[in-house]
């Protein structure tokens, strides 16, 4: 219940949480030995030349037991009219059942005209078999409107490669990345938007940062303002924060030029704070967008 309370403190609606019991009673029960737990990840943030490192404990977690039919999707998408559906590559690869649930979830959302996004977010420690990951992820991408993934994600999670090598000038890399996105968009004509954050690490605590969105229908790249050589506190959460801010901007009716700026701003702000759970306000995001566009410094708020 501690996790539920923390979610409530952050303003998250917890009414749809599925609770597993340990008394061997009901549809979501274990063997009465308490063998299910909530997932844990432990991250060393890194410092200087020492890279960050994350370890996961996902075995015996309740979420791995969720499968098709376990979530009342009619209630979510029909009765409640949820406007946006999102899932990611960590959840989808936790177990065969979560993969099936993710496909069911995205298909149901699509039937109701709900916008759907999928963050590839490949983690080899969750699913080391890339061929297996490709097969699962391709089913979900076929049910997606907004796809999120960096160069490594597209290679590891879907099997797409870019022509550019690591370390090439940014413009050369962006051209190669855009060419790859055009191939992805041709293969999955359901996709409306593809995006990613771009992090160039100079050390564990100093990066350059931007983001791009590719409008598949207009064949147009939208790039956020580049932030160069920025000191950060903790690199975790930058990708999730990029995606969530882009989604928020689109849901507010903003264009892609503005949406990508929101995504980049939110992403860098979360990397300036410990952990990967945002406590950043919309006001802070808009302020950072304005600051970056002006190329200005940081003034104290009094």
Q: Where do the language-model regions lie?
A:
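Conserved phosphate/ATP/ADP-binding segment of small-molecule kinases
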Residues: 112, 126-217
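Conserved post-catalytic alpha-helical subdomain immediately downstream of the catalytic base
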Residues: 204, 220-292, 300-302
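Conserved N-terminal subdomain of the carbohydrate kinase-like
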Residues: 1-89, 286-302
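Short acidic-glycine loop/turn motifs at beta-strand connectors
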Residues: 46-48, 214-220
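Anion (oxyanion) recognition and catalysis
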Residues: 8, 103, 107-111, 141
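Active-site beta-loop-alpha junctions enriched in small/polar residues
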Residues: 59, 90, 121-125, 152, ...
